[in-house]
Each structure stands twice: as structure tokens, then as C-alpha cells.
Amino acid sequence: MSLMNWFEDRRKFSGLIGAFIEKATKGYILSERRKDRHIKIDTTKGLWTRCDNCENMLYIRFLRQNKRICEECGYHLQMSSTERIESLIDRGTWHPMDEDMVARDALKFSDEDSYKNRVLFYQKRTGLTDAIQTGIGKLNGIPIALGVMDFQFMGGSMGSVVGEKITRLIEYGTRESMPVIIVCSSGGARMQEGTLSLMQMAKISAVLQIHQAQKKLLYIAILTYPTTGGVTASFGMLGDVIIAEPKAYIAFAGKRVIEQTLRQKIPDGSQVAESLFDHGLLDLIVPRNLLRGVLSEIFELYSSAPCRRSNNS
């Protein structure tokens, strides 16, 4: 039996690995038929990863096919912005915007390293120019304006480039009467840009006011792990529909900061999506593998709303 056939057979009955976790961590998988026979796995090529929640070893190829959802516990691992675009947008319909926009070190900020060098490091590491990708595409045939933040680029922090790209995306969606979707994954405002970063919160909120209130167009915010700081305090919570992934960490300030400031304990789990949903701060909690279908249903409901029919007539 070939290695790939063995994986497919195991996946049908007991997830990716099931038993033999200890051996898998050493790069070996035991055959059920002949346990004295083993196949060595070359871990140097990055074939495996570990679930952040249950610590089960996961085969990366199957994990990608499953949209980075752990097959053992259902935990949603972090996705890159490119993977999210591929999971939401119809094949061959994606047209990126403002790819050449890069950050400038206006404040000449430096701590352990200069801001300029940090940006260059993450550009080489991720292949992105900054912490968001924006563009136009189709979701099940419906044209949308989509922005996807990438936590792998400086923690998804929002600086002048992220703010400007989101602003231009919303303005384009407003001109073309398109719904706007922003997938949030961020640690908040980028401290290396100071006030230039903080002002993006107000700028984005202003263009969303035009898009939503004046033009009566749809804006959907999708909150993923983690969404914190200035992103939560601005466009993350301004959606007509606010969707979160299961167990997503969503907050303005972290638990430790709140406890040190207020000098009192806050409940465990109070900053996860399920708690926020129970308190009315979210509209939906949607697993990643169901998101396309849910978004399509929302678009259908929105297009048939009375205010939309009167505006289009």
C-alpha cells in the first residue's frame, strides 16, 4: 500500500492520525496491518503541523483541503490572506487592487530594529507588501469588494497602507454599488506609525458611513482569531452583518491589560466569539467551511429587501 493510499484510508475512519500520536511526533506512522513495519516521514519539508487547541499532529495537505480546520477537535487554525481569498472567491475572478502600495517610515521609528527593516523582513517572509490584500472578485457569481487582513504580516497591524487600501476598496465598492466584505485579523493599530495609524480608524469609519447610510449598500465584517485593538474599535464592529469564526478571540484590550487597569479579575472566555454572541455583539458565528454559503444567502436576502427594491426602481 502506498503512503498516500494509507493516508486516505486512515482519514475515512479516524481522522488524520487518530492513534499513534506519539510515533507521529517522531516522524513515523505505524501500519495497522503490520505494526512491525513503519514508514519514515521527512518532517524537514514541513509535511506536518500541530493543532493549537488539541495538539494533535495534522498532515498539512489534508489540513489545507479542510480550510485549516482541525479534523479532531474542529479548531480553526490561522489562515493566510491568500488562502482566505481562494476559499471565498470564484476561481479566475480575483482582481487585486493597490498591490504596489508600501509603508513609509515617516516617524523614523526604531526600537530593536528600524521600522523600515521590519517592513522589509515581513515583505520577504510573507510575499505581501503589507498586512492586507484588497481586490474585486465574485462569490458564487456575485461581484464583491473584498479585503482580507493577514496576521502573519506584523500581527496584522493597521498602519497607513492598510487604512488607505481599505478606504479605497470601500470607495470603489460604493461607486460600483458592490457589497464590501472585510475579513479582520489584527492586533490593532501599528505603533510604529503613531497618530498616522490611529487616524485610519476615523477615515475608514467615515467612508463606511457613506457606503452604508447614504448609499444603502451592504458591508459585512468577518472577525477571525484574533481581532483586537483599533480594528475592533472601528470597522470590525461597524458591519451591517457581523460574523465571527468559532472560538475567535475578539477584544479591544487584552485580558491582562484590563485586569491591571481595573485591578479586578475578568471571567475566562469573556473575549471569545461565543461570549460576545451571547451578549448581542455579533450576528452570526459561522464555521469557515460554511461561510461561502452563508454569505450567498445574506446577499440574496439583502437584494430582495424593500429599501433595495425602491432604490433600484
Curated annotation (Swiss-Prot):
Provide the top EC class. Answer: transferase
One GO MF term, please?
A: zinc ion binding
Q: Does the keyword Transferase apply?
A: yes
Specify the residue ranges making up the C4-type zinc fingers. Answer: 51-73
- At the top level, the lineage of the source is Eukaryota
| E.C. numbers | 2.1.3.15
Where do transmembrane segments lie in this chain? Answer: none
**What is the UniProt remark on how the cofactor binds and its stoichiometry?**
Binds 1 zinc ion per subunit.
Localisation: Plastid, Chloroplast stroma
Cofactors needed by this protein, per the record, are:
Zn(2+)
Query: One GO CC term of this entry?
Result: acetyl-CoA carboxylase complex
Residue positions annotated to bind Zn(2+) are C51, C54, C70, C73
Quickly give the catalysed reaction: N(6)-carboxybiotinyl-L-lysyl-[protein] + acetyl-CoA = N(6)-biotinyl-L-lysyl-[protein] + malonyl-CoA
Q: Mind listing the UniProt keywords for this protein, alphabetically? A: ATP-binding, Chloroplast, Fatty acid biosynthesis, Fatty acid metabolism, Lipid biosynthesis, Lipid metabolism, Metal-binding, Nucleotide-binding, Plastid, Transferase, Zinc, Zinc-finger
Describe the location of the CoA carboxyltransferase N-terminal domain by residue ranges.
47-313
GO biological process annotations for this chain's record?
A: fatty acid biosynthetic process; malonyl-CoA biosynthetic process
Q: Which InterPro entries match?
A: AcCoA_carboxyl_beta (IPR034733), Acetyl_CoA_COase_Trfase_b_su (IPR000438), ClpP/crotonase-like_dom_sf (IPR029045), COA_CT_N (IPR011762)
Involved pathway(s): Lipid metabolism; malonyl-CoA biosynthesis; malonyl-CoA from acetyl-CoA: step 1/1
Q: Which family does it belong to?
A: Belongs to the AccD/PCCB family.
Subunit organization: Acetyl-CoA carboxylase is a heterohexamer composed of biotin carboxyl carrier protein, biotin carboxylase and 2 subunits each of ACCase subunit alpha and ACCase plastid-coded subunit beta (accD).
Q: Which HAMAP family match?
A: AcetylCoA_CT_beta
Q: What does this protein do?
A: Component of the acetyl coenzyme A carboxylase (ACC) complex. Biotin carboxylase (BC) catalyzes the carboxylation of biotin on its carrier protein (BCCP) and then the CO(2) group is transferred by the transcarboxylase to acetyl-CoA to form malonyl-CoA.
Q: How is this protein named in the record? A: Acetyl-coenzyme A carboxylase carboxyl transferase subunit beta, chloroplastic
Species, as recorded: Anthoceros angustus
